[in-house]
């Protein structure tokens, strides 16, 4: 029997967007165990408990890490794309190197995964390995004056995702079916996005398996605890003036709800658990450490801690504001206000990590009859389409020439009284014209290709 007590928000745990007084950007708390729980019989001595892989820096192979209940010799059989297999042996708890003569890399355009069969004593499991690297570096062949970009397997990629909060109208944080996880990813891919930003929630691993299979990049947020440091109205001033505040003094910790050492330790334990859980998935290319200063503290130290846990992925250390100068990006949020160029003095890749949020309530597909929350409201689909075309063509796309290397449109679907989704909350209606969104995203990629990036 499994029992869980999860008081929100008074339990001191990381709670995400759940609230006991929902409204605006805070949503109804989900009661009970909302994720996957299962039991399975395992051999007493030889049980394999975890398999993960890590791509070699030169992309000519990967290491397999196997954990087992007891020290054991491990055999790894790898199916090759051209047919046949290769087999290697090693010890549980140690890296087992797999060399590949003609590696087929995982990428959004070719999300190939190697099939693994791993055995130790009486136990045998199947797994996958996506061979890919991600880093920040110069755009190959571009003018040296261009800002650096995200390189997937050495090729410059513009990371273009919507914000994905993972809520459903009848079940809250729990997807109604496995197909619902795949549906959202497919719907966004069909609109021209190449990934999603999984916002303040760690999904079931089924979600990441679908993203691996579909070639959708995932920006994964760390689940927040503590408290927001500013109100919504204050955040508008912060966006307009680009105000920055520290996060190490006692007063900063108090404002962020992090005065309790136990609360901070819980956050860091959960951070390590998230990295451990999602490490096997090639789709996850970036971690978001803090969002809009919610519970933000000691960002520079925690960025170092996160890199020690996972040196293979990128980090958006402070998404939105209160940038401490670290991380892999200059990351900003911009709602309602006109999009602006990043300053020349900050040469980090510019990541517009939230923007858009255009609202359209669809009769018969909204949460309830109460007031709507959002940033820019429209009365009909034509007005929404016109606004999106103007936003992309006159503001977003021109930023590529000035260092834009990633962007996150808010958002995949409506959530409760927030009506700014590309889809309605029930996922029954695509609100903007699908062909228009596909065209706008194609123009965005074309602008990036014009400076040397991958189309």
Describe each PLM feature range.
Residues 1-210, 214-218, 270, 285-286, ...:
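Secreted/periplasmic carbohydrate-active enzymes, especially glycoside hydrolases
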Residues 186-187, 195-440, 447-454:
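Substrate-binding/catalytic cleft of secreted carbohydrate-active enzymes
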């Amino acid at each position: 029997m499994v029992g869980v007590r999860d008081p929100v928000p008074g339990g001191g745990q990381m709670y995400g967007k759940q609230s006991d007084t929902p409204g605006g950007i805070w949503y109804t708390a989900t009661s009970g165990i909302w994720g996957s729980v299962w039991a399975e019989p395992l051999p007493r001595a030889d049980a394999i408990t975890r398999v993960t892989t890590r791509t070699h820096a030169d992309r000519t192979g990967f290491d397999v890490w196997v954990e087992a209940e007891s020290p054991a010799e491990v055999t790894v059989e790898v199916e090759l794309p051209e047919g046949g297999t290769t087999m290697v042996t090693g010890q549980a708890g140690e890296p087992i190197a797999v060399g590949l003569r003609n590696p087929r890399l995982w990428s959004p355009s070719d999300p190939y995964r190697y099939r693994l069969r791993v055995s130790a004593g009486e136990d045998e499991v199947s797994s996958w390995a996506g061979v890919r690297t991600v880093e920040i570096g110069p755009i190959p062949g571009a003018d040296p004056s261009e800002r650096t970009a995200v390189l997937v397997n050495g090729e410059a990629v513009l990371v273009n995702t919507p914000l994905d909060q993972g809520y459903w109208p009848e079940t809250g944080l729990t997807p109604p079916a496995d197909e619902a996880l795949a549906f959202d990813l497919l719907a966004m891919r069909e609109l021209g996005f190449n990934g999603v930003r999984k916002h303040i929630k760690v999904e079931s691993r089924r979600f990441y398996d679908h993203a691996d299979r579909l070639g959708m990049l995932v920006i994964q947020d760390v689940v927040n605890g503590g408290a927001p440091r500013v109100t919504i109205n204050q955040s508008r001033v912060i966006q307009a003036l680009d105000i920055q505040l520290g996060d190490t003094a006692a007063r900063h910790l108090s404002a962020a709800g992090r005065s309790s050492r136990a609360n901070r330790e819980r956050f860091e334990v959960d951070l390590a658990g998230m990295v451990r859980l999602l490490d096997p998935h090639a789709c996850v290319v970036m971690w978001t450490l803090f969002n809009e200063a919610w519970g933000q503290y000691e960002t520079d130290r925690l960025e170092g801690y996160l890199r020690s846990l996972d040196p293979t992925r990128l980090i958006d250390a402070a998404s939105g504001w209160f940038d401490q100068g670290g991380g892999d990006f200059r990351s900003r949020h911009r709602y309602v206000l006109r999009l602006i160029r990043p300053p020349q003095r900050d040469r980090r890749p510019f990541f517009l990590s939230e923007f858009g949020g255009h609202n359209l309530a669809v009769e018969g597909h909204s949460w309830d009859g109460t007031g709507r929350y959002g940033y820019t409201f429209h009365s009909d689909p034509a007005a929404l389409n016109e606004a999106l075309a103007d936003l992309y063509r006159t503001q977003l796309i021109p930023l590529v020439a000035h260092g834009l290397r990633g962007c996150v449109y808010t958002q995949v679907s409506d959530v409760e009284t927030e009506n700014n989704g590309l889809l309605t909350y029930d996922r029954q209606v695509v609100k903007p014209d699908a062909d228009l969104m596909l065209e706008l995203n194609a123009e965005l990629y074309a602008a990036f290709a014009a400076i040397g990036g991958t189309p």
